[in-house]
C-alpha cells in the first residue's frame, strides 16, 4: 500500500520489520477489504501491520495478576466497554458525581485504555510496566494467540460479543468512513461473502467468539463473557456482574447509574473530544460513534444478505449453546 493511501498506518504495510516481512512471505494470503491483502496467522486473518503488533505483543507483553484485559472482535462495543470499565475501576479516584472534569469528559476512551497490538505496532518498545495498577488494556487478539503470560497469570479477561450481523454492518460503515477510496468499489455482497467465509479482517468471527466462549465456561473466574445486546438492554445489571467478576468491592446503586449515564452513547458521542478529536494514528474520534443500536443491520443488509450471515451463524455455532439476540 502506498504512503499516499487514506488508510491509517495500522492498517497499512509501512515500517514492517524484517522478521514480520519474512513471516508474511510464508503465510496464506487473500485479497482484502480496506487493504490490498490480508494474511492468515494462527487461524485468523490480519493486516500486515496488526500482524506485526500481535507478534511483538506475544514476545514482549508480560501480564500481571492484577491486569484486566478487555477483548472484542472489531466493532463489537469496544469503545463503550472501555469507557464503562475505566469509569468503574476509577470510581474512587474520579467520582462521577463530584467532578465536571472526569477523564472521560475530556479524553477519548481509546486514549485511556491502550490497544495492545496497536500500541506495539506504533511503539514496539512501549513499556506497559509504567501503567498504574490495575492495568486496563484491550485487544482484538484471539484466545489462541494471546501472549502466554496472559494465559498463565491470574489476570482477568472481559470478552464482549455482538450479534455478527450488527458487527459486520458496523465494521462496513467504519471502513467506508476510514478509507472511502479503498472501499468505494467493493460491493457489500462481496464483503458479506468474505465475512461468511471467514476471510475478512479479524475473521473468522466464529472462531474468535467461540474460543472465548468456551474459555469462559472452562474458567469462569478468568474469563467473563458478556454480550453487547445484554449490556444495552440491562446495562446496570451487567455492570454489577462485571464489577463482581473484577472484584471491585461493593458498588452503590447510585454509582452504577452515574457510570451508565456518563458512558451512554448519547453522552459520549456528544462530547467535543469525541466529535472533533483525532487519535495519534490519525483516526477521527467521531468515526467510533455511529448509532450504537441493536438490530441496526436491518438498515443496511438486504434480506438475502442477512439470511446468508444467519446460515453461517447457524452452521458455525450449532451445539455451542451460544445464542444471539437480534
Curated annotation (Swiss-Prot):
Signal peptide: none annotated. InterPro entries: P-loop_NTPase, Sulfotransferase_dom. GO terms for cellular component: Golgi apparatus. GO terms for molecular function: brassinosteroid sulfotransferase activity; flavonoid sulfotransferase activity; sulfotransferase activity. Disruption phenotype: Hypersensitivity to NaCl and ABA in seed germination, and to salicylic acid (SA) in seedling growth. The keyword Transferase applies. It comes from the Eukaryota. It is an enzyme of class 2 (transferase). Belongs to the sulfotransferase 1 family. This is Cytosolic sulfotransferase 12. It comes from Arabidopsis thaliana (Mouse-ear cress).
Amino acid at each position: 500500500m502506498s504512503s499516499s493511501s487514506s488508510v491509517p498506518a495500522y492498517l497499512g504495510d509501512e515500517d514492517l520489520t524484517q522478521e514480520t516481512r519474512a513471516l508474511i512471505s510464508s503465510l496464506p494470503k487473500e485479497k482484502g477489504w480496506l487493504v490490498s491483502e490480508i494474511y492468515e496467522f494462527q487461524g485468523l486473518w490480519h493486516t500486515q501491520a496488526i500482524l506485526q503488533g500481535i507478534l511483538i505483543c506475544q514476545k514482549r507483553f508480560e501480564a500481571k495478576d492484577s491486569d484486566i484485559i478487555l477483548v472484542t472482535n472489531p466493532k463489537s462495543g469496544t469503545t463503550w466497554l472501555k469507557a464503562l470499565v475505566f469509569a468503574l475501576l476509577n470510581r474512587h479516584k474520579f467520582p462521577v458525581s463530584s467532578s465536571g472534569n472526569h477523564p472521560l469528559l475530556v479524553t477519548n476512551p481509546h486514549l485511556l485504555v491502550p490497544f495492545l497490538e496497536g500500541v506495539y505496532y506504533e511503539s514496539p518498545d512501549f513499556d506497559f510496566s509504567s501503567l498504574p495498577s490495575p492495568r486496563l488494556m484491550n485487544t482484538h487478539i484471539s484466545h489462541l494467540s494471546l501472549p502466554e503470560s496472559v494465559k498463565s497469570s491470574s489476570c482477568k479477561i472481559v470478552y464482549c460479543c455482538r450479534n455478527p450481523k450488527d458487527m459486520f454492518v458496523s465494521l462496513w460503515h467504519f471502513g467506508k468512513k476510514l478509507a472511502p477510496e479503498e472501499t468505494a468499489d467493493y460491493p457489500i455482497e462481496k464483503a458479506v461473502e468474505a465475512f461468511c467465509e471467514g476471510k475478512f479482517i479479524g475473521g473468522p468471527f466464529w472462531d474468535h467468539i467461540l474460543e472465548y466462549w468456551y474459555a469462559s465456561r472452562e474458567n469462569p473466574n478468568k474469563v467473563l463473557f458478556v454480550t453487547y445486546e445484554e449490556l444495552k438492554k440491562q446495562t446496570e445489571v451487567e455492570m454489577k456482574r462485571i464489577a463482581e467478576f473484577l472484584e471491585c468491592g461493593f458498588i452503590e446503586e447510585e454509582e452504577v447509574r452515574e457510570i451508565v449515564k456518563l458512558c451512554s452513547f448519547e453522552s459520549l458521542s456528544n462530547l467535543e473530544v469525541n466529535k472533533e478529536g483525532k487519535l495519534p494514528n490519525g483516526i477521527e474520534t467521531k468515526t467510533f460513534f455511529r448509532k450504537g443500536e441493536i438490530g441496526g443491520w436491518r438498515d443496511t443488509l438486504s434480506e438475502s444478505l442477512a439470511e446468508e450471515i444467519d446460515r453461517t451463524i447457524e452452521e458455525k455455532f450449532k451445539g455451542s449453546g451460544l445464542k444471539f439476540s437480534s
